[in-house]
Amino acid sequence: MLKPLGDRVIISFVETEEKSVGGFVLAGASHDATKTAKVLAVGDGIRTLTGELVAPSVAEGDTVLVENDAGLEVKDGNEKVTVVRESDIVAVVK
């Protein structure tokens, strides 16, 4: 398993299927500005100019919304994951 550094977060995108009111499956979600993802690992946070550690706002296991074009896709064993900065995460889904 990869261990992210600083304010980086490792996520795995969740495939979502969008349906219209009539129940038709809409082709692709390319029109969306965000994607849904599951947080797999979180870095320790970032340090301020005074050296204080600011902990991340997300935790392992959270479901989050991430900007569509954010991150770097890497391979972790047989699994493709994406490394993003915490600032690329728009919201935590509750």
Swiss-Prot record:
Keyword field: Chaperone, Cytoplasm
InterPro entries (UniProt xref): Chaperonin_GroES, Chaperonin_GroES_sf, Chaprnonin_Cpn10_CS, GroES-like_sf
GO cellular component: cytoplasm
Main location: cytoplasm
Molecular function terms, GO-annotated: ATP binding; metal ion binding; protein folding chaperone; protein-folding chaperone binding; unfolded protein binding
BP GO annotations: chaperone cofactor-dependent protein refolding
Gene3D superfamilies linked to this entry: GroES chaperonin
Localization of this protein: Cytoplasm
Top-level taxonomic group: Bacteria
UniProt keyword annotation of Cytoplasm present: yes
Entry keyword annotation includes Nuclease: no
Cystine bridges: none
PANTHER family recorded: 10 KDA HEAT SHOCK PROTEIN, CO-CHAPERONIN GROES
Family named by the database record: Belongs to the GroES chaperonin family.
Annotated HAMAP family: CH10
Function: Together with the chaperonin GroEL, plays an essential role in assisting protein folding. The GroEL-GroES system forms a nano-cage that allows encapsulation of the non-native substrate proteins and provides a physical environment optimized to promote and accelerate protein folding. GroES binds to the apical surface of the GroEL ring, thereby capping the opening of the GroEL channel.
Assembly mode: Heptamer of 7 subunits arranged in a ring. Interacts with the chaperonin GroEL.
Name of the featured protein: Co-chaperonin GroES
Provenance organism: Streptococcus agalactiae
Gene from which this protein is expressed: groES
